[in-house]
Regions:
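Long, charge-patterned amphipathic alpha-helical coiled-coil/hairpin "stalk" segments used as oligomerization
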Residues: 90-201
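N-terminal cationic and glycine-rich segments that engage phosphates or anionic surfaces
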Residues: 2-69, 75-76, 80-123, 134-137, ...
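Short glycine/threonine-rich loop/turn motifs
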Residues: 175-233
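Intrinsically disordered, compositionally biased charged tails
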Residues: 1-7, 226-310
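Short phosphate-engaging motifs
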Residues: 78-79, 171-172, 209
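Residue-level signature of catalytic and energy-coupling elements of molecular machines
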Residues: 16, 72, 164, 216
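Small/polar loops that bind or transfer phosphate-bearing groups
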Residues: 74-75, 167-168, 205
Length: 310
């Protein structure tokens, strides 16, 4: 176990996750996560970072396994492309352009804007768009492009996210404030100049270097993938159990139907001798009738003989 932890720390070190900000820009609340000071820069304790990655990963895995969404937020230049790529890989919503004010606290209005984007798409599909004037089409196209840029990545988010993952909480302070107001759990890469007290799951790390961001985001995406895999496996096992539960019922019905058929066959076989008996009786009837005819003839002859004598 120690070897795995050391390997993880070495990878974090190679990615430059340990570099903090200048000592004069530090936030004293980050002191527990700072290992030392070197050349006027704070060095982050990577053993604590590794532990926090593990802790955050477990929580993210549970959220993903429950089928809820995690909203990724990163608008700084060196982070936006990496975060967008990782979020797409796990089919999660993300914001990499300017944070729309009220994105969480005024979610109903944001949803209306997203629906407006969908309406424009429908207009283009059914031909309504072409009935507009050239000027109107240009205005609609500009509006669609603006909405796509700011809200395109959250188009499928029909309700508030279950959690927020933020890169640089100081820069994304509006997003953090909105999440706090709505009691949405916050996961974040927290540098030495940030306040960790408002974050639920902090990952002390360098949030300025793209290599460091990529390393942390890869670990986060892997945790989310595990959760999604667990959810998929759970669904498959539930469907399998349901199918197995239905199978015995069908077998039982088949087994119950079999004796009925057998009974029908037996009844037919039992009925056969009765029919034979009826036939025998009918066949026997002429034999009984034959002596009766002889008796009648005998009586007729006797009567004729009596008349002759008279």
């Amino acid at each position: 176990m120690a070897k795995d932890n050391n390997t993880e720390v070495k990878e974090l070190l190679n990615a430059g996750v340990h570099f903090g900000h200048l000592t004069r820009k530090w936030n004293p609340n980050m002191a527990p996560y700072i290992y030392m000071e070197r050349n006027g820069i704070h060095i982050i304790n990577l053993y604590k970072t590794a532990a926090k990655i593990q802790e955050a990963g477990e929580a993210l895995k549970k959220i993903a396994a429950s089928g809820r969404k995690i909203l990724f937020v990163a608008t700084k230049k060196q982070a936006k492309d990496i975060v967008a790529e990782k979020a797409k890989s796990v089919n999660m919503p993300y914001i990499t352009e300017r944070w729309p004010g009220g994105m969480l606290t005024n979610f109903v209005t944001i949803r209306k804007a997203v629906k407006k984007m969908a309406t424009i798409d429908r207009m283009k599909q059914d031909g309504t768009f072409m009935t507009l004037s050239k000027k109107e089409r240009l205005q609609v196209d500009r509006l669609r492009a603006k909405l796509e840029k700011n809200l395109g990545s959250i188009g499928e988010m029909s309700r508030l996210p279950a959690a927020l993952f933020v890169v640089d909480t100081t820069r994304e302070h509006i997003a953090v404030a909105e999440a706090i107001k709505l009691n949405i759990p916050i996961f974040a890469m927290v540098d030495t100049n940030c306040d960790p007290r408002v974050i639920d799951y902090i990952i002390p790390s360098n949030d300025d270097a793209s290599k460091s961001i990529d390393k942390i985001m890869t670990a986060v995406a892997d945790a989310v993938k595990e959760g999604l895999s667990e959810r998929k496996a759970g669904k498959e096992s539930a469907e399998k159990a349901k199918a197995e539960k239905q199978a015995p019922v069908e077998t039982k019905e088949t087994e119950e139907a079999a004796p009925v058929k057998e009974a029908a066959v037996v009844t037919e076989e039992t009925a056969a001798p009765k029919e034979a008996a009826v036939v025998s009786e009918e066949a026997a009837a002429p034999k009984k009738a034959a002596p009766a005819k002889k008796a009648v003839k005998k009586e007729v002859k006797q009567e004729e003989a009596t008349k002759e004598e008279e």
